């Protein structure tokens, strides 16, 4: 099959890193696994057993829960990402829509040593949206990716102080992407008469598909005493092998000339293809230290193996490479520090700060304007009864200003986001 367009490379690259926008972690990883964690910027996430949400990060923590428990909630993400450019028509405000990230978890202690649990959370996913008449439609149109993680885990208390956990992950990923002609296409492919007549909102590339991927996770917890413990969690890479359809509305009359520019015209016809999307492995180490009867400190260091992702390669059904695009992501780190205070037996307040490092190095795009970001978080838990409680959390994310070029067009992106979380916990 012939080589696809430079635009198509940008399109499928967006499928890889769509969630980077502003929502949470580096590249296309989401951090929003619990509302209680949100309130402390996820500091101590692999060592704190607030509720059944421990399933999402460190399954070994299930050994600390003494009663069956469920946790249900959601985090509302309100991003604000703006682009500026010295080129007329390429600036754009609010490229990422709001989103709701749901979470559902349950833990069931079988006896003093064994516990099982499961959960559902969105660990990858966001969207970027540009108007179909945007001048840079060739670079940024509509991108939507959701990766829902289903987890089943078990925990075993090896000794009075040491526990281990193991889990299986099934991830269902669904992607839909569109790009438009805009004016950038004519700049990129000049002197093609048939393109001059294309309206800016002409769909020049469309891709959609869904697929399952599978992985595993493990964790351990060591309790020095009732007030101090550390936890380590590891989540394996999950490989998603998308199978979907690609099409564009380039006129077939211009096919031969477009081919010299590296563009395959389909005239609206769909072409089947595959795309490998790796969701990288990561590990996290956390600590929890109760300094007084009411005050505790907690911290985390998280390391994600983005450097495993070297390139993005799409293939046709005949096995031939449609394109290969160098990504060269770098490993990223996240550090977080938080504190909790029990105001009363019924009310706990918490706060945290975190620094989240970008995984993108030299390959930023307007669909994925990844950048370093700082978290500022506050939250609280209120216990109505010993068995019923609610968590509330808020975080403000401030991204570092980022200047880059895509296809020769200069851009500067500024990103921030507000996250609002609410969760209900019930013990049986």
Swiss-Prot record:
It is a multi-pass membrane protein. Residues 1-25 form the signal peptide. Keywords: Cell outer membrane, Membrane, Signal, Transmembrane, Transmembrane beta strand. Its main location: membrane. One of its GO terms (cellular component) is cell outer membrane. The keyword Transport does not apply. It holds the Pfam family Toluene_X. It is found in: Cell outer membrane. One of its GO terms (molecular function) is long-chain fatty acid transporting porin activity. Belongs to the OmpP1/FadL family. This is 47 kDa outer membrane protein. It comes from Pasteurella multocida (strain Pm70).
């Amino acid at each position: 099959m012939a080589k696809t367009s430079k635009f198509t490379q940008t399109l499928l690259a967006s499928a890889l890193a769509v969630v980077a926008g502003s929502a949470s972690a580096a590249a296309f990883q989401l951090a929003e696994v619990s509302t209680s964690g949100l309130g402390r910027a996820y500091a101590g996430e692999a060592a704190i057993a607030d509720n059944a949400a421990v399933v999402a990060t460190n399954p070994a923590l299930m050994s600390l829960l003494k009663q069956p428990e469920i946790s249900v909630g959601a985090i509302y993400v309100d991003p604000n990402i703006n682009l500026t450019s010295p080129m007329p028509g390429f600036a754009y405000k609010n490229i990422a829509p709001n989103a709701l990230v749901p979470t559902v978890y349950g833990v069931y202690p079988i006896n003093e040593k064994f516990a099982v649990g499961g959960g559902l959370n969105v660990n990858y996913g966001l969207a970027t949206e540009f108007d179909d008449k945007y001048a840079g439609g060739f670079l940024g149109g509509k991108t939507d990716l959701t990766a829902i993680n289903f987890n089943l885990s078990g925990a075993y208390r090896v000794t009075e102080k040491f526990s281990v956990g193991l889990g299986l992950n099934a991830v269902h990923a669904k992607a839909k992407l569109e790009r438009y002609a805009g004016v950038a296409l004519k700049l990129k492919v000049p002197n093609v008469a048939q393109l001059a007549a294309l309206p800016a909102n002409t769909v020049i590339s469309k891709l959609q598909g869904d697929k399952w991927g599978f992985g595993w996770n493990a964790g351990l917890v060591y309790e020095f005493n009732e007030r101090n413990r550390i936890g380590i969690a590891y989540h394996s890479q999950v490989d998603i092998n998308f199978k979907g359809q690609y099409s564009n509305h380039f006129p077939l009359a211009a096919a031969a000339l477009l081919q010299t520019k590296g563009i395959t015209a389909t005239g609206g016809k769909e072409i089947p293809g595959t795309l490998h999307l790796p969701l990288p492995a990561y590990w996290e180490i956390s600590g929890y230290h109760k300094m007084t009867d009411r005050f505790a400190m907690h911290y985390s260091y998280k390391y994600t193996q983005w450097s495993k992702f070297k390139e993005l390669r799409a293939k046709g059904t005949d096995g031939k490479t449609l394109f290969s695009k160098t990504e060269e992501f770098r490993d990223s780190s996240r550090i977080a520090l938080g504190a909790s205070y029990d105001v009363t037996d019924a009310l706990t307040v918490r706060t945290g700060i975190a620094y989240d490092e970008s995984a993108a190095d030299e390959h930023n795009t307007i669909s994925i304007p990844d950048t370093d970001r700082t978290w500022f978080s506050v939250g609280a838990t209120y216990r109505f009864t010993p068995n019923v409680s609610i968590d509330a959390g808020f975080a403000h994310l401030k991204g570092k200003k980022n200047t880059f070029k895509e296809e020769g067009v200069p851009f500067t992106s500024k990103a921030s986001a507000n996250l609002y979380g609410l969760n209900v916990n019930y013990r049986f």
